[in-house]
Amino acid sequence: MLELDYNLTTLEKIIAIVADYARQGGMPTSYLDKMAADLIRIHKCEPAFLGFTPTGKAGLGGYPAVMCVSINGEVIHGIPSDDKILQDGDVVKLDCGIKMPDGQYDDGATTVLVGDCSATARKLVKSTKEALEAGIKQAKAGKTNHDITKAIEAVAKRDGFAVVHGYGGHGIGTELHMEPHIANEMLYKEDGETPVDEPVKLTSGMRIAIEPMFASKRGFVKTAADGWTLQIIGGGIAAHFEKTVTIK
């Protein structure tokens, strides 16, 4: 029986319950989406992802589900389906967002292993989770978004994994996606020392979603034919964790 930590947020409890079912395998990913929808309603929240249209996706009419369920080489934004059945050995990313009764948003994700997974998969998931923890340690007033980025990137380098290029965390509050961007890797100008973007100082009360995404081989990605699912190019698997934190 799943025992939930009372210190978990509403969203973390929802994701933990869905994850407990997902790791058993044998069910379609659409079942996990329906479960998330039911739990969100029970907690008197609203699904943040359903109908959400991020920058560059205006022509798609909004995301069609409550939860993103991405398998193996899929990184994020996988659309739940009756045809996608979780199998032994799958690496499953569960990403969900809610709008709470007070009007604030929350965003979170976890990666679960179904059955007997490879040593690489286990190490990748452990590394990505540790990167999240390293990033959270830097999420303090007076620090910058670059401090979080460097902490996440250092874990990937330590463990020999690739950071998924071009994606990362974000500010969150009365909107799902807000400034600042929390990158998972530092990008520098031609001199190799000057960051491409200016650091943003973290201030007390600011809420940010930190979300490392690592790949077992290369970090280059493409969008699948469905217009949403982000896939690793050249094979391999990916892991993704996310937590919304308040700066103190």
PLM features: residue spans?
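Active-site neighborhoods and metal-handling regions in enzymes and metal-associated proteins
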Residues: 1-248
